[in-house]
A protein has these predicted regions:
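Extended catalytic/binding region for NAD+/ADP-ribose chemistry, centered on the ART fold
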Residues: 33-57
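Conserved NAD+-utilizing ADP-ribose enzyme module
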Residues: 2-14, 36-37, 57-173
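Short, flexible loop/turn elements at secondary-structure junctions
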Residues: 21, 48, 76-78
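N-proximal short alpha-helices
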Residues: 24, 45, 102-106
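Short aromatic-glycine-(Arg/Gly/Cys) micro-motifs in beta-strand/loop hairpins
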Residues: 12-35
């Protein structure tokens, strides 16, 4: 059973954005990079401005293309339905469980996922969080201290679609 925060929930279709340097006509999970927050998958954001920031970073990193925000609709009732065909994990906020999950995924440089979720929703490990993650991995702080320090940092939320089944529920607009 999945519980979704009212803050993230809308009635009907949820609009999600993916920042890139190209128009994405067909999502190809094989192009996913290893060592990401929730694993290899397709990452989306409910905030169009944040997706544009990612598009700008991607264009600069790839040194080609122009910043483009691809938009998708997703039926968010699939996140809370008891009979959903999808395996969904939602992290409401920074937590010990979230931090351990991020660490496992970031350390995984194989093509085999460390979890079996179709969709994962939760805070982005942005620059501030990334700094804390590096401090943790270098042994300067422990995981409990990291989570405590992040408690005062307002999280930006990301949506991870990690399987073809999950991708099939995204409708490009």
């Amino acid at each position: 059973h999945v519980v979704v925060s009212k803050e993230w929930r809308t009635i009907g279709m949820l609009k999600l954005y993916h920042g890139s340097n190209v128009v994405i006509d067909k999502i190809d999970l094989c192009r996913s990079r290893k060592g990401k927050d929730f694993g290899c998958g397709f990452y989306l954001n409910p905030n169009k401005d944040q997706a544009m920031e990612m598009a700008v970073r991607t264009s600069k990193r790839m040194q080609e293309g122009e910043p483009i925000v691809n938009a998708y609709l997703f039926d968010d009732s699939l996140l809370s339905s008891e009979c959903t065909p999808l395996s969904v994990k939602i992290f409401e906020d920074y937590s010990l469980e979230w931090a351990e999950f991020i660490l496992k995924n970031r350390k995984n440089m194989t093509s085999h996922p460390v979890h079996s979720y179709d969709i994962v929703i939760g805070p982005i490990a942005d620059d501030t969080v990334g700094l804390q993650m590096r401090r943790l991995m270098q042994g300067y702080i422990d995981i409990e201290r990291m989570v405590e320090e992040l408690r005062f940092h307002k999280p930006a939320i990301q949506y991870f679609f990690g399987t073809e089944k999950a991708i099939s529920y995204l409708k490009r607009i």
